[in-house]
């Protein structure tokens, strides 16, 4: 038996190998120090290139406001992030504003020994604007809620600035948009000859 894996070499540290999010809460227990094979992220608010990154994707099912909180398991850890609309250009279009524009990013962080804590998109946590950072001069740690439309697909990159391996949670519970459907998969029709 021959099996060809079309995803050979793809890693969750690259957009093409991203984890598909399909629930309100995702826990990443093993953050990475890997940057993948492709340096996709050169976002507006990040002071440096992509580093120690993990990629996630989701497709909006119902219009609304997108909100998420990235909460480090260790409050001293500093996570930066960028969000891309990949509906038209896919992962290949990242870095090309017309194809897969960056719609939000945050690289705000405090200097040790101050804890960095959570970041993300959350107006209810004081979020403003759509591009905050870099460093401790251009906050806050949260961006304003983002209007999203059914059918749009997004890629979220989370970068592990402190290079900790402790991980984080991503919580979409404040979103008014539905990001995943609750319809169980149905078996495809088939015929027996």
What does each model-identified segment do?
Residues 181-192:
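Proline-enriched interdomain boundary motifs that mark the N-terminal boundary
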């Amino acid at each position: 038996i021959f099996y060809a894996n079309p995803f050979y070499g793809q890693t969750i540290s690259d957009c093409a190998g991203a984890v598909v999010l399909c629930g309100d809460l995702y826990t990443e227990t093993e953050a990475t120090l890997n940057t993948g094979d492709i340096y996709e992220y050169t976002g507006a608010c990040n002071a440096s290139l992509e580093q120690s990154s993990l990629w996630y994707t989701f497709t909006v099912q119902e219009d609304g406001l997108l909100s998420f909180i990235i909460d480090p398991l260790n409050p001293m850890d500093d996570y930066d992030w960028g969000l891309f609309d990949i509906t038209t250009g896919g992962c290949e279009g990242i870095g090309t504003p017309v194809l897969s524009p960056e719609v939000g990013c945050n690289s705000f962080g405090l200097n040790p020994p101050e804890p960095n804590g959570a970041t993300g998109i959350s107006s209810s946590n004081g979020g403003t604007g759509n591009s905050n950072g870099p460093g401790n001069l251009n906050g806050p740690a949260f961006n304003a809620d983002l209007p999203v439309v059914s059918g749009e697909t997004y890629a979220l990159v989370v970068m592990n600035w402190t290079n900790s391996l402790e991980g984080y949670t991503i919580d979409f519970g404040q979103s008014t948009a539905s990001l995943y459907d609750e319809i169980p998969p149905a078996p495809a029709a088939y015929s027996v000859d």
